[in-house]
Amino acid sequence: MSNNNSKLEFVPNIQLKEDLGAFSYKVQLSPVEKGMAHILGNSIRRVLLSSLSGASIIKVNIANVLHEYSTLEDVKEDVVEIVSNLKKVAIKLDTGIDRLDLELSVNKSGVVSAGDFKTTQGVEIINKDQPIATLTNQRAFSLTATVSVGRNVGILSAIPTELERVGDIAVDADFNPIKRVAFEVFDNGDSETLEVFVKTNGTIEPLAAVTKALEYFCEQISVFVSLRVPSNGKTGDVLIDSNIDPILLKPIDDLELTVRSSNCLRAENIKYLGDLVQYSESQLMKIPNLGKKSLNEIKQILIDNNLSLGVQIDNFRELVEGK
């Protein structure tokens, strides 16, 4: 299968091999170049467990509760337990929705579950039977949960500036929709087959998850495509094309931007700082959902990196992506 030029001589295929139930699946990638399946499997596994984005509750405001150490009459769980239960609610948002408030209001006794949330179009609660609280006697119980799209497990993801109302409680959000990943490699003689076991929380399809992991990994290594050996032919450090300032190759995803700002830029296909600096203020303000607050945040990020808007860079994307 391999030749001296190390070129692939086959058309690879990715498919769902088996649905194991309980949001567990086997995804098959084949054929894979001999010796590459373990490398590919490890890369997919690490990206799936660390870098996919998803929706999660980031803060909650419970009626008649001032802080997380409060207790409620006729409620079995304390507030800490209620917040912990809210963290486990699996929420699926349609593309274009990156933040919203969910309301829950009941007057009953018994278990209050995720299915009691009032949802709107574009919002789906996957695990409707997830318990939130247990009411030992009939009583009113209501809360407002703020849901946001993010990446990675964020420690108290609702930063202090977002705790605007009295009684707002931050939730240690778990954005990653992937719960477990394993892989197995099968030798086919002149090629290999990679099988990836993926367990999700139900908010993402397995093929989409693996594909997104591959896309994200490719984005991260694409900045090295333009690396070249020095023209003097000496071994040692590999240099980036001298026409590009290395700071301009920094991915937007690596900046400390809010979810809204990051999503707006991503929707505009702004991948690197080098893409961003070529925009003017007026051009950025025309991007849907990007307001003055996001603009000021972006300008501060550029200042922190000794950059500014309105810079012209000829053929930047072509140089970066080797086109």
Swiss-Prot record:
* Alpha C-terminal domain (alpha-CTD): annotated span: 244-323
Please give one Pfam family short name: RNA_pol_A_bac
Q: Which GO terms describe its biological process?
A: DNA-templated transcription
Q: Which UniProt keywords apply?
A: DNA-directed RNA polymerase, Nucleotidyltransferase, Transcription, Transferase
Instruction: Answer yes or no on keyword Nucleotide-binding.
Output: no
The record's listing under Gene3D superfamilies reads:
5' to 3' exonuclease, C-terminal subdomain, DNA-directed RNA polymerase, insert domain, RNA polymerase, RBP11-like subunit
Top-level EC class: transferase
EC numbers listed for it are: 2.7.7.6
Q: Which InterPro entries match?
A: DNA-dir_RNA_pol_insert, DNA-dir_RNA_pol_RpoA/D/Rpb3, DNA-dir_RpoA, RBP11-like, RNAP_asu_C, RNApol_insert_sf
Q: Name the family the entry cites.
A: Belongs to the RNA polymerase alpha chain family.
Q: What does this protein do?
A: DNA-dependent RNA polymerase catalyzes the transcription of DNA into RNA using the four ribonucleoside triphosphates as substrates.
Q: Domain annotation text?
A: The N-terminal domain is essential for RNAP assembly and basal transcription, whereas the C-terminal domain is involved in interaction with transcriptional regulators and with upstream promoter elements.
Alphabetized HAMAP family for the sequence: RNApol_bact_RpoA
Q: What is this protein called?
A: DNA-directed RNA polymerase subunit alpha 1
This protein's species is: Francisella tularensis subsp. holarctica (strain LVS)
Gene name for this UniProt entry: rpoA1
